Amino acid sequence: MEVDPIHGENAVRPDGATAPVVDWDTIADWWRGEAAGDPVYREDVAPMLSRLMEPTTAPILDLGCGDGQWLRWLDRDVGRAIGCDRSGALLADAVATHPVALCELPSLAWLQGQTLGTAFSVFVFDLVENIDEFFAEVGRVVVRDGSLVVIINHPAFTAPGSGPFMDPDLDVFWRWGEYLERGTSLVPAGSGAVKMYHRSTGDILTSAAQAGWQLEEMIEAPLGSAAIERDPSYAGQEDIPRFLGVRWRR
């Protein structure tokens, strides 16, 4: 299950009236519409994932595969792919084309060690509370010299209290909010909301390093020009980071 990368500015603070989703199956229909209808995945996310992923003869795992959109996309370029997710309703879509497993990240107890060539996640890492366990578990199941690819909303974007503001000269700047502190926000999702966990970039890289992952490539990217043209409210944010993509080597 992924969170729409564009509508994060609609997030409310944890003391808001919207309760976080407990059963992800209740928003499965909403997610199918979001995944199919948001061109940002094709325009901005797919090129980043293509750059970070590498062909491998060992199995590839999509961590939080949802309905399997990235599993189907990967078939064009890289090797055998499987998926896991907490939503049985979305896995029912993904299983039509790929092997899948019901799981609750960060646990990968259903997998034996040294099983995968690559693991990747797209807009799922922000939903995992314990990132130390995430990096340790993925490190357990990926072979030596294997890789981990993570694409997330940029931590500058997920920090509670962050957001754009315009000065008297009409220049757009970014308010950092509580960037240096770990925190949470609730993001509207269908009739409910999901809890997103904010960590600074330094926290993320340190946690990965402590689990034995070596940083190989990191990409910071703004919202693409096509998305900004479609929604003029994003004008002035062309140089503000919106996405972070990282590849680590085991």
Task: Put a short name on every predicted segment.
Residues 2-56, 69-73, 90-93, 148-182:
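Conserved class I S-adenosyl-L-methionine
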Residues 207-250:
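C-terminal lobe and adjacent flexible extensions of AdoMet/dcAdoMet transferase-like proteins
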Residues 132-147:
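A short glycine-rich, Lys/Arg-flanked "PGG" loop and its adjoining helix->strand segment in the class I
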Residues 117-131:
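A short SAM/SAH-binding and catalytic strip from SAM-dependent methyltransferases
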Residues 183-184, 195-218:
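Short alpha-helix
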Residues 61-63, 67-108:
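Class I SAM-dependent methyltransferase SAM/SAH-binding core
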